[in-house]
Amino acid sequence: MDDFERRRELRRQKREEMRLEAERLSYQRNDDDEEEAARERRRRARQERLRQKEEGDVSGEVTEKSEVNAQNSVAEEETKRSTDDEAALLERLARREERRQKRLQEALERQKEFDPTITDGSLSVPSRREVNNVEENEITGKEEKVETRQGRCEIEETETVTKSYQRNNWRQDGEEEGKKEEKDSEEEKPKEVPTEENQVDVAVEKSTDKEEVVETKTLAVNAENDTNAMLEGEQSITDAADKEKEEAEKEREKLEAEEKERLKAEEEKKAAEEKQKAEEEKKAAEERERAKAEEEKRAAEERERAKAEEERKAAEERERAKAEEERKAAEERAKAEEERKAAEERAKAEEERKAAEERAKAEKERKAAEERERAKAEEEKRAAEEKARLEAEKLKEKKKMEEKKAQEEKAQANLLRKQEEDKEAKVEAKKESLPEKLQPTSKKDQVKDNKDKEKAPKEEMKSVWDRKRGVPEQKAQNGERELTTPKLKSTENAFGRSNLKGAANAEAGSEKLKEKQQEAAVELDELKKRREERRKILEEEEQKKKQEEAERKIREEEEKKRMKEEIERRRAEAAEKRQKVPEDGVSEEKKPFKCFSPKGSSLKIEERAEFLNKSAQKSGMKPAHTTAVVSKIDSRLEQYTSAVVGNKAAKPAKPAASDLPVPAEGVRNIKSMWEKGNVFSSPGGTGTPNKETAGLKVGVSSRINEWLTKTPEGNKSPAPKPSDLRPGDVSGKRNLWEKQSVEKPAASSSKVTATGKKSETNGLRQFEKEP
């Protein structure tokens, strides 16, 4: 709330200031109106004094007081304004006196006009007195307000504006006389008039007013005593006016003389003050000049002394710098010698390192060749094992087929036995229906018939097995009846139909096996083609590696040569710098480090300076070499990469069973291709068989075994021999990796079972052996 009140008060003050500023501007514009109103008031007051000549001393005193108040108020207003020069003041005084004389004459003429009607004038005196009293009261009240306004704050200046508007109305009433007294307003408004001058003007006006009052009194007495004495009164008035004029002239001259003397005294005083001030300023300037000259003299002496000191120090500095330069030259020579030796040692170490790298590389290649030979032997061994496994599988498959055929024959025999029993039952029924004459008469014959019936199925089964095995049929034994022949014929017909069905099924299975064999042959051809493509890719990579190695050696030779040239050039530059010893201390500022120390600790600081110089120069040489190497980093990126790979490969790998050999970069890429399955037609893993091979199972394996055993020349021509394997052949690496992974105890449980799991030599997928 207090903040709100404070802001509101500030806004109110700003509005008030703006309003007062506007009123001040209007007041300045209305100064002329105020001056005209003051002149109008004085003119009316003088007229009223002339009109009140018939009144008593009371009215005279009232007019005197009002005039004095008016003059005092005007004087107070005039004290706030500035005056012109002395000549303008005198001219204004002269013009004012002339106008006063004219106004007196006009008053006398108006008095003469009032004389014939003196009674009317006496009757109207009270009324005019009341009007004059009202006007005088208003004028005095206004003048008092003007006086109080000058003592108040700026907020109360609004009253002055309103009164100025009222005075403008009064000016319109007496516009004609206001025009006459425009110049008088300028005279009565002197700028910066002192209070003494205002008091003198007031005293003069008071004296003239008193004389006018006396004059009016005498005129009133003469008029009352006798109207016939008008001429004498007029004469006395004119005499009194002349006398007053002379006295006023004397008083004016006296005042002018006093004013001139006062102004002259003030001018002399001002001139003396100015002169004294000028003398003081002159003395101060001289003092400043003297102090400045002394300061300059001291500064010049100081500069001379400092210059001499600097020259002495510079000479000492040059001597010390010369000694330091000689010492540094000796150090530089020793340092150059050390650098030369260090460069030679570095070159020697570099050559030894390169030789070691070459040896390591040769050792690596030898080991790689041994690995390839071992992989080749392992491949041959695996091929032999695979062949033996295929033979064993073939025998096992043949045995299974025989068992299956035996089971089928047994089932067919059971079926035939059942059919034979049915037929025997039918034959028994027919026999019973035959006439009794055909039946055997004796029990001996019946027993014989029963035995024959029991033997007949056995002989039929025997004949069937003999026919299947290729044994010729034997003739019927003696004592066998002819009834067995139709039974055998019927059984032969039934068994022949079943054999035809089995033969048709066997032919359909053989056709399927042929189709699957053809598909397997096509897949083998594709695998051979892919293997040939891989071999070509490996050959190209090997050639590319050899070419890159040759280029790398050439670049290394060029780099060695360039480094030697750079070392020789720097040595020559260092020798030239040592020969050019600077004669002055200017070039010493360009040195990397200088140490000027006190004599006590000079030895330690010089040693420290030498160390810093050496380190600075070494740091200055290293960036140059680094920039030279970095400038060719794009062209040498492959060289650095191959060198890093060679360094890593140069480390001898421990032949542990759990560690894998570190292959070359090309072999690693091909190995990743093998692992991703991009080489094969299908991306299946080594452990998961193909869908087609999974469907083949026994038949495909038997056909593959037949293909391996019957057509060995077809296998030799497209498939590369173990001797055809190149140093970076991927198959050898892959088989070696598989061998080592098989040897691991952790992987043995998953890859090697009780019967064993092995991969084929031609890149075929693994076929698990049936348990």
Swiss-Prot record:
<feature type="repeat" description="9">
    <location>
        <begin position="363"/>
        <end position="375"/>
    </location>
</feature>
<feature type="region of interest" description="Myosin and calmodulin-binding">
    <location>
        <begin position="26"/>
        <end position="199"/>
    </location>
</feature>
<feature type="modified residue" description="Phosphotyrosine">
    <location>
        <position position="27"/>
    </location>
</feature>
<dbReference type="GO" id="GO:0003779">
    <property type="term" value="F:actin binding"/>
</dbReference>
<feature type="compositionally biased region" description="Basic and acidic residues">
    <location>
        <begin position="525"/>
        <end position="592"/>
    </location>
</feature>
<keyword id="KW-0677">Repeat</keyword>
<feature type="region of interest" description="Weak actin-binding">
    <location>
        <begin position="726"/>
        <end position="752"/>
    </location>
</feature>
<dbReference type="GO" id="GO:1903611">
    <property type="term" value="P:negative regulation of calcium-dependent ATPase activity"/>
</dbReference>
<dbReference type="GO" id="GO:0051017">
    <property type="term" value="P:actin filament bundle assembly"/>
</dbReference>
<keyword id="KW-0206">Cytoskeleton</keyword>
<feature type="compositionally biased region" description="Basic and acidic residues">
    <location>
        <begin position="723"/>
        <end position="742"/>
    </location>
</feature>
<feature type="repeat" description="6">
    <location>
        <begin position="324"/>
        <end position="336"/>
    </location>
</feature>
<feature type="modified residue" description="Phosphothreonine; by CDK1">
    <location>
        <position position="711"/>
    </location>
</feature>
<feature type="compositionally biased region" description="Basic and acidic residues">
    <location>
        <begin position="139"/>
        <end position="155"/>
    </location>
</feature>
<feature type="repeat" description="5">
    <location>
        <begin position="309"/>
        <end position="321"/>
    </location>
</feature>
<dbReference type="Pfam" id="PF02029">
    <property type="entry name" value="Caldesmon"/>
</dbReference>
<feature type="region of interest" description="Disordered">
    <location>
        <begin position="104"/>
        <end position="599"/>
    </location>
</feature>
<dbReference type="InterPro" id="IPR006017">
    <property type="entry name" value="Caldesmon"/>
</dbReference>
<keyword id="KW-0009">Actin-binding</keyword>
<keyword id="KW-0963">Cytoplasm</keyword>
<feature type="compositionally biased region" description="Polar residues">
    <location>
        <begin position="679"/>
        <end position="691"/>
    </location>
</feature>
<feature type="region of interest" description="10 X 13 AA approximate tandem repeats">
    <location>
        <begin position="251"/>
        <end position="390"/>
    </location>
</feature>
<feature type="compositionally biased region" description="Basic and acidic residues">
    <location>
        <begin position="203"/>
        <end position="215"/>
    </location>
</feature>
<feature type="compositionally biased region" description="Basic and acidic residues">
    <location>
        <begin position="170"/>
        <end position="194"/>
    </location>
</feature>
<feature type="repeat" description="3">
    <location>
        <begin position="279"/>
        <end position="291"/>
    </location>
</feature>
<comment type="similarity">
    <text>Belongs to the caldesmon family.</text>
</comment>
<feature type="repeat" description="2">
    <location>
        <begin position="266"/>
        <end position="278"/>
    </location>
</feature>
<feature type="repeat" description="4">
    <location>
        <begin position="294"/>
        <end position="306"/>
    </location>
</feature>
<feature type="repeat" description="1">
    <location>
        <begin position="251"/>
        <end position="265"/>
    </location>
</feature>
<feature type="compositionally biased region" description="Basic and acidic residues">
    <location>
        <begin position="240"/>
        <end position="435"/>
    </location>
</feature>
<feature type="modified residue" description="Phosphoserine; by CDK1">
    <location>
        <position position="717"/>
    </location>
</feature>
<protein>
    <recommendedName>
        <fullName>Caldesmon</fullName>
    </recommendedName>
</protein>
<feature type="compositionally biased region" description="Basic and acidic residues">
    <location>
        <begin position="442"/>
        <end position="484"/>
    </location>
</feature>
<feature type="region of interest" description="Tropomyosin-binding">
    <location>
        <begin position="622"/>
        <end position="632"/>
    </location>
</feature>
<feature type="modified residue" description="Phosphotyrosine">
    <location>
        <position position="640"/>
    </location>
</feature>
<dbReference type="GO" id="GO:0006936">
    <property type="term" value="P:muscle contraction"/>
</dbReference>
<keyword id="KW-0597">Phosphoprotein</keyword>
<keyword id="KW-0112">Calmodulin-binding</keyword>
<feature type="compositionally biased region" description="Basic and acidic residues">
    <location>
        <begin position="509"/>
        <end position="518"/>
    </location>
</feature>
<feature type="region of interest" description="Strong actin-binding">
    <location>
        <begin position="612"/>
        <end position="644"/>
    </location>
</feature>
<dbReference type="InterPro" id="IPR006018">
    <property type="entry name" value="Caldesmon_LSP"/>
</dbReference>
<dbReference type="GO" id="GO:0044548">
    <property type="term" value="F:S100 protein binding"/>
</dbReference>
